[in-house]
From Swiss-Prot:
This protein's UniProt keywords: Apoptosis, ATP-binding, Kinase, Magnesium, Manganese, Membrane, Metal-binding, Nucleotide-binding, Receptor, Serine/threonine-protein kinase, Signal, Transferase, Transmembrane, Transmembrane helix
InterPro entries for the chain: Activin_recp, GS_dom, Kinase-like_dom_sf, Prot_kinase_dom, Protein_kinase_ATP_BS, Ser-Thr/Tyr_kinase_cat_dom, Ser/Thr_kinase_AS, Snake_toxin-like_sf
Alphabetized SMART domains for the sequence: GS, S_TKc
Protein name: Activin receptor type-1C
Residues making up the signal peptide according to the UniProt record: 1-25
Tissue: Expressed in brain, kidney, lung, liver, testis, ovary, adrenal gland, heart, prostate, gastrointestinal tract, and spleen. Distributed throughout both adult and embryonic central nervous system and pancreatic islet cells.
Cofactors (names): Mg(2+); Mn(2+)
Bilayer disposition of the protein: Single-pass type I membrane protein
Family named by the database record: Belongs to the protein kinase superfamily. TKL Ser/Thr protein kinase family. TGFB receptor subfamily.
Role description: Serine/threonine protein kinase which forms a receptor complex on ligand binding. The receptor complex consists of 2 type II and 2 type I transmembrane serine/threonine kinases. Type II receptors phosphorylate and activate type I receptors which autophosphorylate, then bind and activate SMAD transcriptional regulators, SMAD2 and SMAD3. Receptor for activin AB, activin B, activin E and NODAL.
GO cellular component, one term: activin receptor complex
CDD domains membership: STKc_TGFbR1_ACVR1b_ACVR1c, TFP_LU_ECD_ALK7
Length: 493
């Protein structure tokens, strides 16, 4: 063989060997290929990886195909979790790998440090929340005060407080102006909203009575609940009747509604009489003959004014009380009386001949009801019927007073009318049986006959208690009779 042919043959064999190697591809270590002597071939790359699994390093070695290599997924490492390498020579992945050493762990927190770490942020957040709520409430209060100031400031300027007037001055101004009813409505609102309540002095079916202070003066505040708005409105309306004001009728000062944020209170402000009701007064005190006459005359005077119609442009309609009893009569400092609680009162319009009866389901006190009311024979279309019923009740109040009158050192203990005939809270039926069927009346003790004043008072009582209402005395007649008695007893009512 010539040298030239021998060279050509060698070149051909070399090319065949190279082609064979290229066809075989890249050889790599494969830990999962135990059937092929832990070797694999690929057109892509050799792959070696170490991964942290359950706290231990796990080594993987294999081949990566060309599509997988192009996806650029297998050849990326993750800090402290995996370390991956790709290479492109035979068995280049036959290497030893380790994950990078992690930085030393931060010191663990103990119970105390952990408590501090949790508690401090919580406390700071709580304080921030409370400060935020407080700031919002303060802003709201400031807004309300500003709003209230803007609403009420004209009233204060209009009124009274700055003028230095007393309640007596205001009442006198209202009387002198010709109305004789009460201060103007703007003045009433100003007074009511500047009263400071002191203490509760009584409770009733309507609500509560409080002792209050206004500009250093004592006032009484009758507080109705919103469900008794009809009673509050009616009583305020009656008290503001033209020419009603009288020394023996409770002095009306103001009526207003007050919203305390939760519910609405209805206020009726009047003069304050520290001795309380006649009921309380008689329970605590014994009265002299002159004292008895003064009390009786003041009641008759107040009732006569209430019953009387005053004709004229500034006239007053006739009014019947409908709930006369010792608890609805107050005792003043001078030991005279003032009739109060006009919530059930009725007015008579003589021109139209109509009776203004309140739309109120409540009736008077059963113990003090006249016979015609108990047996339902009262003619409610005639106004005189209501006045006659008042007279019957006044006769019972006089009996309560007379029992506490001391004559010759003898005095009866205080009792309510019919105390020995009916229970403490009698029903209509029980009162009807005693008053209408048996025609009984409170007992007049024999010792009253030894005192002229008590004899006269006893006669007045009997004439107030007639079963026939038309036969009873009028309030004016009672007043005149007791006035004569007052002269004899040298008392000044």
């Amino acid at each position: 063989m010539t040298p030239a042919r021998r060279s050509a043959l060698s070149l051909a064999l070399l090319l065949v060997a190279l082609a064979s190697d290229l066809a075989a591809g890249l050889k790599c270590v494969c830990l999962l290929c135990d059937s092929s002597n832990f070797t694999c071939q690929t057109e892509g790359a050799c792959w070696a990886s170490v991964m942290l699994t359950n706290g231990k390093e796990q080594v993987s070695k294999s081949c990566v195909s060309l599509p997988e290599l192009n996806a650029q997924v297998f050849c990326h490492s993750s800090n402290n979790v995996t370390k991956t390498e790709c290479c492109f020579t035979d068995f280049c992945n036959n290497i030893t790998q380790h994950l990078p050493t992690a930085s030393p762990d931060a010191p663990r927190l103990g119970p105390t440090e952990l408590t501090v770490v949790i508690t401090v942020p919580v406390c700071l957040l709580s304080i921030a929340a409370m400060l935020t709520i407080w700031a919002c409430q303060d802003r709201q209060c400031t807004y309300r005060k500003t709003k209230r100031h803007n609403v009420e400031e004209p009233l204060a300027e209009y009124s009274l407080v700055n003028a230095g007037k007393t309640l007596k001055d205001l009442i006198y101004d209202a009387t002198a102006s010709g109305s004789g009813s009460g201060p103007p409505l703007l003045v009433q609102r100003t007074i009511a909203r500047t009263i400071v309540l002191q203490e509760i002095v009584g409770k009733g079916r309507f609500g509560e009575v409080w002792h209050g202070r206004w500009c250093g003066e004592d006032v009484a505040v009758k507080i109705f609940s919103s469900r008794d708005e009809r009673s509050w409105f009616r009583e305020a309306e009656i008290y503001q009747t033209v020419m009603l004001r009288h020394e023996n009728i409770l002095g009306f000062i103001a009526a207003d509604n007050k919203d305390n944020g939760t519910w609405t209170q209805l206020w009726l402000v009047s003069e304050y009489h520290e001795q309380g009701s006649l009921y309380d007064y008689l329970n605590r005190n014994i009265v002299t003959v002159a004292g008895m006459v003064k009390l009786a005359l003041s009641i008759a005077s107040g009732l006569a004014h209430l019953h009387m119609e005053i004709v004229g442009t500034q006239g007053k309609p006739a009014i019947a009380h409908r709930d006369i009893k010792s608890k609805n009569i107050l005792v003043k400092k001078c030991d005279t009386c003032a009739i109060a609680d006009l919530g059930l009162a009725v007015k008579h319009d003589s021109i139209m001949n109509t009776i203004d009866i309140p739309q109120n389901p409540k009736v008077g006190t059963k113990r003090y009801m006249a016979p015609e009311m108990l047996d339902d024979t009262m003619n409610v279309n005639i106004f005189e019927s209501f006045k006659r019923a008042d007279i019957y009740s006044v006769g019972l109040v006089y009996w309560e007073i007379a029992r506490r009158c001391s004559v010759g050192g003898l005095v009866e203990e205080y009792q309510l009318p019919y105390y020995d005939m009916v229970p403490s809270d009698p029903s209509i039926e029980e009162m009807r049986k005693v008053v209408c069927d048996q025609k009984l009346r409170p007992n007049l003790p024999n010792q009253w006959q030894s005192c002229e004043a008590l004899r006269v008072m006893g006669r007045i009582m009997r004439e107030c208690w007639y079963a026939n209402g038309a036969a009873r005395l009028t309030a004016l007649r009672v007043k005149k009779t007791i006035s004569q008695l007052c002269v004899k007893e040298d008392c000044k009512a």
